[in-house]
């Protein structure tokens, strides 16, 4: 089961740290062919620089490494984690459910075989990236993300505000999250915050009727190839525990989950039977496996549930509907809200971040920015402060379905009420009339809210509202959202964001077709369309033909102007 990811004319490169010289920050270098010009009859070739691009493919794109999915990825961060001296390796897993799955011999054929014993903070030790940052410590993870965000800006002479100290300060103040469970050492450090590159998340996961472990692992790798910055396993079908283990051990990006889904499976789908003890064991189980962040719908309050009654589409969040029903059936405050401090105590022992789930997000543009949505946001603002008190990194989930003229209010209100914690939104979709094209309706809103300050965008595929996405849907969703995120980075003026655009535009003007393909987000798709047009590698395409190509005519004008001089 060896896996490789390849990109045309690209080379995997590693930049060293300065504070920590032994760290190797992975990125991809794209080679370009020379520009060709003529001085009279003389042909002149002028070299074009290599272009460095952010790379989420991990060791899978390193030709010097052999990756076997049955053994998992190299444990990149384990030496850093253990070297700090504040964690201990447990003699065995401590989750009751995890132990039960481990001891069930009927699952041996499904099990990932090379499972390491989990780590946990030593008693009295604060081991989260936020705790280190508050103490003024720049960790290897912090320097790693600073280098990764800048790529080769220093070499290009591009000024940047993103230094290891800036990263530390943003994490200490809660303005950025570096999701890095100590039990997922395979993950390459990355950062989520509005003063950094806009990130995208990919949702995968099986359902009760569809998919297998192999398919979900394949989707995870596929997401990493095309640029997914984080991955959420939203499995609700069989063998959730084993599926998650396979994904985490082979995933070079942070992995998130919604623990309430598995907790509900443990009570056979009966919401009334959910309780704190089952949920607590689920948290520990997943912390010990290596989940980097949890979506937790603790913002649902007993007194807020009825606010959704006025809506056209009610409650559309799975986690939100589960907790709302639990509150109503028991006529009690949510156990997630009541035990939020206990939740944070657990997460802090493994450095798991909390993503405060928007259980009352609007599911139609009719319901956008309503009382229910903003009441939950107010509670999230309270919860984020409680998380920070426990040194738990936190970010805020947002909508949803929001027309363009209401997007700005979402961003401004989130910054104010949630103390500038990172915002993480699902789109938003700006219209409801395009089933089958909701990757487009949502990317329009995603680009806009990313520009306004959202730190991470949750992708939407063409099958949103229709079916479980397959591998091709994952590709389309990721590429669509990479476009939205990059458009936001350009609008925000992120250091070096325009380097790739300028290189591709120059290649287009000079009819360097191969460079256009190789610099694009999806080289295979671009080249496929070009070849399907029966082109030769000439100075025009079939869109305009030889006589109507504006760039060709523009180049001729330049040549004539040069000759006149």
From Swiss-Prot:
Catalytic activity of the protein: 5-amino-1-(5-phospho-beta-D-ribosyl)imidazole + S-adenosyl-L-methionine = 4-amino-2-methyl-5-(phosphooxymethyl)pyrimidine + CO + 5'-deoxyadenosine + formate + L-methionine + 3 H(+)
An example Gene Ontology CC term for this record: cytosol
GO BP annotation list: thiamine biosynthetic process; thiamine diphosphate biosynthetic process
Entry binding sites for Zn(2+): 401, 465
Positions that bind substrate: 203, 232, 261, 297, 317-319, 358-361, 397, 424
Binding positions for [4Fe-4S] cluster per the UniProt entry: 541, 544, 549
Chain coiled-coil ranges: none
Taxonomy, superkingdom: Bacteria
Cofactors (names): [4Fe-4S] cluster
Pathway(s) the chain acts in: Cofactor biosynthesis; thiamine diphosphate biosynthesis
Cofactor note: Binds 1 [4Fe-4S] cluster per subunit. The cluster is coordinated with 3 cysteines and an exchangeable S-adenosyl-L-methionine.
Entries under PANTHER family matching the protein: PHOSPHOMETHYLPYRIMIDINE SYNTHASE, CHLOROPLASTIC, THIAMINE BIOSYNTHESIS PROTEIN THIC
Function, as annotated: Catalyzes the synthesis of the hydroxymethylpyrimidine phosphate (HMP-P) moiety of thiamine from aminoimidazole ribotide (AIR) in a radical S-adenosyl-L-methionine (SAM)-dependent reaction.
Protein name as it appears in the record: Phosphomethylpyrimidine synthase
Organism placement in taxonomy: Bacteria, Pseudomonadati, Bacteroidota, Bacteroidia, Bacteroidales
């Amino acid at each position: 089961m060896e896996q490789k990811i390849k990109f045309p004319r690209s080379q995997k490169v590693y930049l060293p740290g300065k504070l920590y010289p032994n760290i190797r920050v992975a990125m991809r270098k794209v080679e370009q062919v020379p520009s060709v010009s003529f001085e009279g009859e003389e042909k002149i070739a002028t070299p074009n620089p290599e272009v460095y691009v952010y790379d989420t493919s991990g060791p899978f794109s390193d030709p010097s490494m052999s990756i076997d999915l049955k053994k998992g990825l190299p444990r990149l961060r384990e030496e850093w984690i253990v070297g700090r001296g504040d964690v201990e390796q447990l003699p065995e897993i401590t989750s009751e459910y995890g132990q039960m799955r481990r001891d069930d011999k009927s699952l041996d054929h499904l099990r990932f075989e090379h499972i390491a014993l989990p780590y946990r903070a030593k008693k009295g030790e604060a081991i989260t990236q936020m705790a280190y940052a508050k103490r003024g410590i720049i960790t290897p993870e912090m320097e790693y993300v600073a280098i990764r965000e800048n790529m080769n800006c220093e070499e290009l002479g591009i000024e940047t505000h993103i230094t290891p100290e800036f990263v530390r300060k943003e994490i200490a103040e809660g303005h950025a999250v570096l999701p890095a469970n100590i039990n997922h050492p395979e993950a390459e450090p990355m950062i989520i915050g509005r003063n950094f590159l806009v990130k995208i998340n990919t949702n995968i996961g099986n359902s009760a009727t569809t998919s297998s472990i192999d398919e979900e692992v394949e989707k995870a790798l596929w997401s990493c190839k095309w640029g997914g910055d984080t991955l959420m396993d939203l499995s609700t079908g069989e063998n959730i525990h084993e599926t998650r283990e396979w994904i985490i051990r082979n995933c070079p990006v942070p992995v998130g989950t919604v623990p309430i889904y598995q907790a509900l499976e443990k009570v056979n789908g009966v919401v009334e039977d959910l309780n704190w003890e089952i949920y607590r064991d689920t948290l520990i189980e997943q912390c010990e496996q290596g989940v980097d962040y949890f979506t937790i719908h603790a913002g649902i309050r007993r007194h807020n549930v009825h606010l959704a009654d006025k809506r056209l589409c009610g409650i559309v969040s799975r986690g939100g509907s589960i907790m709302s029903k639990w509150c109503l059936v028991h006529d009690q405050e949510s156990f997630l809200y009541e035990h939020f401090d206990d939740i944070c105590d657990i997460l802090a022992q493994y450095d798991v971040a909390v993503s405060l789930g928007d259980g009352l997000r609007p599911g139609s543009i009719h319901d956008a920015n309503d009382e229910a949505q903003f009441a939950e946001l107010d509670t999230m603002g309270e919860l984020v402060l409680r998380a920070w008190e426990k040194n738990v990194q936190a970010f805020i989930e947002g909508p949803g379905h929001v027309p363009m003229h209401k997007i700005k209010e979402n961003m401004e209100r989130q910054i104010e009420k949630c103390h500038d914690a990172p915002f993480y939104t699902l789109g938003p979709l700006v219209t409801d009339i395009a089933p089958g094209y909701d990757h487009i309706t949502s990317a329009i809103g995603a680009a806009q809210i990313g520009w306004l300050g959202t730190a991470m965008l949750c992708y939407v595929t063409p099958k949103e509202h229709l079916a479980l996405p397959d591998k091709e849907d994952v590709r389309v969703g990721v590429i669509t959202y990479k476009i939205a995120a990059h458009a936001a980075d350009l609008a925000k003026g992120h250091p070096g964001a325009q380097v790739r655009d300028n290189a591709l535009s120059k290649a287009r003007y000079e009819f360097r077709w191969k460079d256009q393909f190789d610099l694009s987000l999806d080289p295979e798709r671009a080249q496929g369309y070009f070849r399907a047009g029966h082109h030769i590698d000439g100075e025009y395409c079939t869109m305009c033909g030889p006589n109507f190509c504006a760039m060709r005519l523009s180049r001729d004008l330049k040549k004539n102007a040069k000759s006149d001089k």
